[in-house]
Amino acid sequence: MTMRATRVGEQMKKELGDIIGRKLKDPRIGFLTVTDVRVSGDLQIAKVYISVLGDEKKREETLKGLAKAKGFIRSELGNRIRLRKTPEIHFEFDESIDYGNRIETLIHELNANKEES
């Protein structure tokens, strides 16, 4: 990513958190956090990584709600960020948090087994 794409991604992350948290009223969208935004070098595509609190069903419902509101989110983003063209938004789950939790669980299990022996 170029320096400009990185700056645009950080600004989008901040604005998306505000838009999703305050402007969207869809009951399908649960408690979520925008963890990262990666913008392509030409500023045409933005991958938005989200973390959702809840089970797999809640995550899927949240993704459906975000897909339905994608046009509204993009227009709000266009009003807040000065770009010639607002990037196309793609929402994806941030698997790194689940991966980190899994590693932490494994370490705790290893430590518990070590103390028992």
Swiss-Prot record:
Keywords associated with the record: Cytoplasm, Ribosome biogenesis
BP GO annotations: maturation of SSU-rRNA
Subcellular location: Cytoplasm
Taxonomy, superkingdom: Bacteria
Annotated InterPro entries: KH_dom-like_a/b, RbfA, RbfA_dom_sf, Ribosome-bd_factorA_CS
Keyword Cytoplasm on entry: yes
MF annotations from Gene Ontology: ribosomal small subunit binding
PROSITE patterns from the UniProt entry: RBFA
Record GO cellular component, one term: cytosol
UniProt keyword Cytoplasm present: yes
Record's subunit section: Monomer. Binds 30S ribosomal subunits, but not 50S ribosomal subunits or 70S ribosomes.
Functional note: One of several proteins that assist in the late maturation steps of the functional core of the 30S ribosomal subunit. Associates with free 30S ribosomal subunits (but not with 30S subunits that are part of 70S ribosomes or polysomes). Required for efficient processing of 16S rRNA. May interact with the 5'-terminal helix region of 16S rRNA.
Family named by the database record: Belongs to the RbfA family.
Name of the protein: Ribosome-binding factor A
Organism of origin: Bacillus licheniformis (strain ATCC 14580 / DSM 13 / JCM 2505 / CCUG 7422 / NBRC 12200 / NCIMB 9375 / NCTC 10341 / NRRL NRS-1264 / Gibson 46)
Lineage: Bacteria, Bacillati, Bacillota, Bacilli, Bacillales
